[in-house]
Amino acid sequence: MEKSIFAVVGGDARQIALANMLAAEGITVYCSGFEHAAASLIGVASTDPLTAVLMAETVILPMPPTRDGETLNAPLSTYRIALNDEFCAALRGKIVFVGIASKLREVSPGYAQLNLLDYYANESFLLRNAQATAEGALAEIITHYPRTVCGSRVLVTGCGRITRFLAPMLARLGANVTVAARKPTDRSWAVSVGLEALSFPKSLRKAKEFGIVINTVPAPVIDTKWIDALSPDALVMDLASLPGGVDWDTCARRKIKAIRALGLPGKYSPETAAEIVKETVMLILEEG
């Protein structure tokens, strides 16, 4: 079987764009899990998940591969794609690319024995994906916040890759941006690029001042105390991977608008997101 035969199974609009890009380069591509958007596929063969995997040597699964630990992350599928022993067996002997491979290994011991290559572990991928996520977060703010970004008080919690793209971007649009970070070195970075910086305890004491609160920390940092301290017309956005870091029940009790903003590259920039995955996959294959 030729290495030029790929399977793209599950995922959102970025996986559709990825399949189309591969096919446009003359690569044979089998797809599954895109029934709700089948008309968007160009030059690829649509089939069931097992057939797609069995026909290919290289399989590309989404990021994350699962949200419930039992089925493939396939929001565009008309049916649940079970991550059962049969699907696992079909993947044996294949080169399997996946975003956040640990999520798949946790499903069952069989998945831990597969040849899984994690494109999410590639630093170039992470940086470019963070940039796309930051732009998507800006789109969500513009969509859901009733005021302009310019002049708004914004708090961004955490100081990872997404924050380092998003916080300066918002500041360039005229927002007054504060970064809440645990490490003194992260707070020093924020100050060095012209932002305000606070520890988490100090940011809590100023919570009522912020109109927009954006969490990037996958831990319960925007908790009940935090939500109770916010202005009632604040917007809370959680960019952190599940389970996130926002107390949703308290947001609902206080009727504070809160958004769980996951998969933003796939929602707002699927073609760029697909290019990032494709280039990362091809680089890993070339490097052997």
Task: Report residues per predicted region.
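NAD(P)-binding Rossmann-fold cofactor-contacting core
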Residues: 25-41, 173-193
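Short acidic-hydrophobic, aromatic-tinged amphipathic segments that line or gate anion-handling sites
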Residues: 43-51, 196-203
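Phosphate-coordination loops involved in phosphoryl transfer and adenosine-cofactor binding
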Residues: 2-5, 93, 150-153, 233
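Residues in the short beta-alpha loop(s) of Rossmann-like NAD(P)-binding domains
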Residues: 12, 33-35, 102, 182-184, ...
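Rossmann-like adenosine-cofactor binding region
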Residues: 64, 68, 80-93, 193-266
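Glycine-rich adenosine-cofactor-binding loop
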Residues: 6-17, 22, 150-171
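Glycine/serine-rich phosphate-binding loop and adjoining beta1-alpha1 elements at the start
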Residues: 61-151, 280
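Rossmann-fold NAD(P)-binding glycine/threonine-rich loop
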Residues: 95-119, 239-285
